[in-house]
Amino acid sequence: MKFSQILVLAAIAVAAISAQDAAPATTPDTATATTPAAATTTTTTTTPAADAGTASTEQTTTAGPEAAGATNGTTTTPPADGTQTATAPLDATATEESSASGEMTPTVGTDTSDQVSDSTAAGPSTPEGSMTGTSTPKASDSSSSATDTTSGASHTTMAVACATVMTVGAYFL
């Protein structure tokens, strides 16, 4: 009876090794494995998404000597058209409103050339490759066969070790 137990355990170990060698450990992504991502140096700036719990957020920043307030009861306001004079600070007051959809509403004098609305941008707010610099493909994208070979060897080693332990255990039972 012990001899038959050893044969059954050996057959299970052989079946486990064969099944693991036949199927790859991970399925390679054929689209990225055959065509690595192209390098890019495009700089894209996106606005952050509004908090899900708030309907709108308003932020006001004040700069310049007017921030402390006038002492004689009068207030002077520099032009808010984006121009700068020698005596007036840059846009003493700038207000930006952020709605729940993530769109930014700039005021006059605010540079909006690099703002992108989250509602029109596809994907996450900072997609891969949109950062400054050169993007490189992941190691798993360009060479998945090396990962599969290593993982397959690891599974084979583990199956042999498991079969050995089971065989020795069955012998002493």
UniProtKB/Swiss-Prot annotation:
Spans annotated as Disordered: 22-155
Biased composition (Polar residues): 95-133
Bias (Low complexity) ranges: 22-89, 134-155
GO biological process: sporulation resulting in formation of a cellular spore
Keywords in alphabetical order: Sporulation
Organism domain of life: Eukaryota
Tissue: Germinating spores.
Annotated function: Could be a structural protein required for the infection process of B.lactucae.
Protein name, UniProt field: HAM34 protein
Gene source species: Bremia lactucae (Lettuce downy mildew)
Gene: HAM34
